[in-house]
């Protein structure tokens, strides 16, 4: 019995001890919770706020690690935890705009004309922007607003930067060989920083084909050519227009009759079939080229800037392909074997000077088997001095292995050989020599003339062409000589480019009515194989295209000419050799994303504005970032702009920037500029 009582007492004692321990533990638990809610958030045994970072348990063998900062008491009060997630931070307004420089780093040092500091900090978030003709600053597509560019002075309506650089021309060591007619571009930072004004009374150009025969006087307000050449049936003024009867110095009865005579002399010339691309040297007002267009012939008409006042400007206003260019000390910007026929009618060039170096340049550009047509006084006059010039010309052409195939009246026609056999059979020491095999006859950018005969390709490349129009879509042999990465798939690339642009141009013709908007003079600023121009020709859009091959890419000019198209080499970091208001359409596909590494995009856009006619259009296909930045610049030039998706859809990294240089805006700017000038004088 006693043992039983002792056992019960022991059990009761253990029970009480356990109960007391539990009560003390519960009391400590609630006491700790009370302290935690009073602000001791660093108590590691309890926290009402869930842990924000994961807890990692380490092996005891690794060593014990303590979060010391978690044990430090902070005297400042801690706010109680929020029952709802904290609101997102206010959006930060971006106040700095930058571009990626050539080193690949972001920089905020850039220039897009003059800008308003306050407006530059106002951001637009719209997806498409259309510019306004008002002078007020408006927000643009992306990140910054740009103040409108100023208008250049009134005396710059016909300014060509690289040909009107008076200070550079004054510094030339010599001008005996026409150096003043060559490119003498402004130094970096000295180019255009304003938009070129239009002449007073400027009107929308007369559409083709009427423009072949008449243009508005106020668009090219110069009468000197009428005074000098009116008696030669070139040009005359009637009321508010210039009229072009179609004559020339050596074909006063009209270009059509003159062309018929050439065709009768050499039937194999076959205009529009065998002969597709022609060079007219010293072109006057380009009636020769204008009348060849009706025979499916493209003629590049060239002349220096001031031999006859504004002759190239008249040609371009008529809607005829033309460029300001001269035979001086450098190669012309066209490839070897480019032209099926070269024409010179009283072009005022001494072909025999310096042992015929200028005729050697013609020989470089003339296609193997092509024709040189010379209409000049030495051909038919019997004065002693002129007869000597004729004999010198015969001697030179014989040494060039040209064959005089026909001489009739005032016209003489030579034919270039189709291979090098004649050159190699000449006697030792006969000049001019053949160029060495290392010479690249297609290298033309700032390259001096060479006193040697350009070799003809032994494999017949450049000479074996399909007749027009089959040659337009036939991959030419010289496609294999272009310095590009692909070798085997070149023809496939050629065909793919043609199909690509035909599909796009078909959409433009149907949706944007390209056949109805009066496109005539077109410039493709990065032409590739010429697929854009070929598509326009194939779809019968009544225009001509000058295909520009940038110096920064592969030289595809030989392919351009072998297709029966026109092209030229150019560096878009420099101004283009043409008058203001030359083109109805400027097309640039992938140009700016490449050239922005070398060139100032604002300078390029100002040059585009200079050569674009009022009412003209610009189509830029490039990356999203590039087109957004260009849209801002276009707005600053008062272009009407809109950014569109490509056919690839909204997720494509490319966009199409459509721009229009509205005539009303140009006229409004000119009027406002004149008012400001008068106000300053008053």
From Swiss-Prot:
<keyword id="KW-0333">Golgi apparatus</keyword>
<dbReference type="Pfam" id="PF03141">
    <property type="entry name" value="Methyltransf_29"/>
</dbReference>
<keyword id="KW-1133">Transmembrane helix</keyword>
<dbReference type="GO" id="GO:0032259">
    <property type="term" value="P:methylation"/>
</dbReference>
<feature type="glycosylation site" description="N-linked (GlcNAc...) asparagine">
    <location>
        <position position="419"/>
    </location>
</feature>
<keyword id="KW-0489">Methyltransferase</keyword>
<feature type="glycosylation site" description="N-linked (GlcNAc...) asparagine">
    <location>
        <position position="125"/>
    </location>
</feature>
<feature type="topological domain" description="Lumenal">
    <location>
        <begin position="33"/>
        <end position="682"/>
    </location>
</feature>
<feature type="glycosylation site" description="N-linked (GlcNAc...) asparagine">
    <location>
        <position position="273"/>
    </location>
</feature>
<keyword id="KW-0472">Membrane</keyword>
<feature type="glycosylation site" description="N-linked (GlcNAc...) asparagine">
    <location>
        <position position="103"/>
    </location>
</feature>
<keyword id="KW-0812">Transmembrane</keyword>
<keyword id="KW-0735">Signal-anchor</keyword>
<feature type="glycosylation site" description="N-linked (GlcNAc...) asparagine">
    <location>
        <position position="350"/>
    </location>
</feature>
<feature type="topological domain" description="Cytoplasmic">
    <location>
        <begin position="1"/>
        <end position="11"/>
    </location>
</feature>
<feature type="glycosylation site" description="N-linked (GlcNAc...) asparagine">
    <location>
        <position position="173"/>
    </location>
</feature>
<comment type="similarity">
    <text>Belongs to the methyltransferase superfamily.</text>
</comment>
<protein>
    <recommendedName>
        <fullName>Probable methyltransferase PMT12</fullName>
        <ecNumber>2.1.1.-</ecNumber>
    </recommendedName>
</protein>
<feature type="glycosylation site" description="N-linked (GlcNAc...) asparagine">
    <location>
        <position position="395"/>
    </location>
</feature>
<feature type="glycosylation site" description="N-linked (GlcNAc...) asparagine">
    <location>
        <position position="600"/>
    </location>
</feature>
<dbReference type="GO" id="GO:0000139">
    <property type="term" value="C:Golgi membrane"/>
</dbReference>
<dbReference type="InterPro" id="IPR029063">
    <property type="entry name" value="SAM-dependent_MTases_sf"/>
</dbReference>
<feature type="glycosylation site" description="N-linked (GlcNAc...) asparagine">
    <location>
        <position position="193"/>
    </location>
</feature>
<feature type="transmembrane region" description="Helical; Signal-anchor for type II membrane protein">
    <location>
        <begin position="12"/>
        <end position="32"/>
    </location>
</feature>
<feature type="glycosylation site" description="N-linked (GlcNAc...) asparagine">
    <location>
        <position position="67"/>
    </location>
</feature>
<dbReference type="GO" id="GO:0008168">
    <property type="term" value="F:methyltransferase activity"/>
</dbReference>
<keyword id="KW-0325">Glycoprotein</keyword>
<keyword id="KW-0808">Transferase</keyword>
<feature type="glycosylation site" description="N-linked (GlcNAc...) asparagine">
    <location>
        <position position="625"/>
    </location>
</feature>
<feature type="glycosylation site" description="N-linked (GlcNAc...) asparagine">
    <location>
        <position position="155"/>
    </location>
</feature>
<dbReference type="InterPro" id="IPR004159">
    <property type="entry name" value="Put_SAM_MeTrfase"/>
</dbReference>
């Amino acid at each position: 019995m006693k043992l039983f009582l002792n056992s019960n007492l022991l059990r009761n004692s253990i029970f009480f001890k356990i109960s007391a321990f539990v009560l003390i533990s519960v009391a400590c638990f609630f006491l700790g919770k009370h302290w935690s809610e009073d602000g001791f958030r660093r108590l590691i045994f309890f926290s009402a706020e869930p842990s924000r970072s994961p807890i990692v348990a380490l092996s005891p063998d690794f060593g014990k690690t303590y979060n010391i900062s978690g044990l430090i008491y902070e005297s400042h009060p801690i706010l109680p935890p929020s029952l709802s997630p904290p609101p997102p931070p206010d959006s930060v307004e971006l106040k700095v705009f930058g571009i990626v420089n050539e080193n690949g780093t972001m920089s905020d040092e850039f220039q897009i004309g003059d800008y308003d500091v306050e407006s530059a900090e106002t951001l637009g978030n719209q997806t498409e922007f259309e510019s306004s003709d008002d002078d007020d600053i408006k927000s643009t597509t992306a990140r910054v607003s740009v103040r409108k560019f100023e208008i250049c002075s009134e005396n710059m309506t016909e300014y060509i930067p690289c040909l009107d650089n008076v200070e550079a021309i004054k510094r030339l060591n010599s001008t005996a060989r026409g150096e003043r007619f060559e490119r003498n571009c402004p130094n970096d930072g000295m180019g255009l920083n304003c938009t070129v004004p239009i002449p007073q009374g400027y009107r929308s150009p007369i559409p083709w084909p009427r423009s072949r025969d008449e243009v508005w006087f106020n668009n090219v307000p110069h009468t000197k050519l009428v005074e000098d050449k009116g008696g030669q049936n070139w040009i005359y003024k009637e009321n508010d227009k210039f009229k072009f009867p179609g004559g020339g110095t050596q074909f006063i009865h009209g270009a059509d009759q003159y062309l018929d005579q050439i065709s009768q002399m050499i039937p194999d010339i076959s205009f529009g079939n065998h002969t597709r691309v022609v060079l007219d040297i010293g072109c006057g007002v380009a009636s020769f080229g204008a009348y060849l267009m009706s025979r499916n012939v493209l003629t590049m008409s060239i002349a220096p800037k001031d031999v006859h006042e504004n002759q190239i400007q008249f040609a371009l206003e008529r809607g005829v392909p033309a460029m300001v260019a001269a035979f001086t000390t450098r190669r012309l910007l066209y490839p070897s074997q480019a032209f099926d026929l070269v024409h010179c009618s009283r072009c005022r060039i001494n072909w025999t000077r310096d042992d015929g170096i200028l005729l050697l340049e013609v020989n470089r550009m003339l296609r193997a088997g092509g024709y040189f047509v010379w209409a000049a006084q030495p051909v038919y006059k019997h004065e002693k001095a002129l007869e000597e010039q004729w004999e010198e010309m015969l001697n030179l052409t014989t040494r060039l292995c040209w064959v005089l195939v026909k001489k009739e009246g005032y016209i003489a026609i030579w034919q270039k050989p189709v291979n090098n056999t004649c050159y190699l059979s000449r006697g030792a020491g006969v000049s001019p020599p053949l160029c060495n095999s290392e010479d690249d006859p297609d290298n033309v950018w700032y390259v001096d003339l060479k006193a040697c005969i350009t070799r003809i390709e032994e494999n017949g490349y450049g000479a074996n062409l399909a007749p027009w129009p089959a040659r337009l879509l036939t991959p030419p042999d010289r496609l294999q000589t272009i310095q590009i990465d692909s070798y085997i798939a070149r023809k496939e690339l050629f065909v793919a480019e043609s199909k690509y642009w035909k599909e796009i141009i078909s959409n433009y013709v149907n949706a944007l009515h390209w056949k109805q908007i009066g496109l005539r003079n077109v410039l493709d600023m990065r032409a590739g194989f010429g697929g854009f121009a070929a598509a326009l020709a194939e779809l019968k859009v009544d225009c001509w295209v000058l295909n520009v091959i940038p110096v920064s890419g592969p030289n595809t000019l030989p392919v351009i000419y072998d297709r029966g198209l026109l092209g030229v080499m150019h560096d878009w970091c420099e101004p283009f050799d043409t008058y203001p208001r030359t083109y109805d359409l400027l097309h640039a596909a992938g140009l700016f994303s490449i050239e922005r590494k070398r060139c100032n995009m604002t300078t390029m856009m100002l040059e585009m504005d200079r050569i674009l006619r009022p009412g003209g259009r610009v189509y830029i296909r490039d990356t999203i970032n590039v087109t957004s930045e260009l849209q801002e610049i276009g707005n600053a030039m008062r272009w009407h702009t809109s950014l569109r998706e490509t056919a690839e859809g909204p997720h494509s990294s490319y966009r199409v920037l459509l721009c229009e240089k509205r005539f009303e805006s140009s006229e409004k700017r000119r009027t406002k500029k004149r008012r400001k000038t008068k106000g300053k004088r008053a």
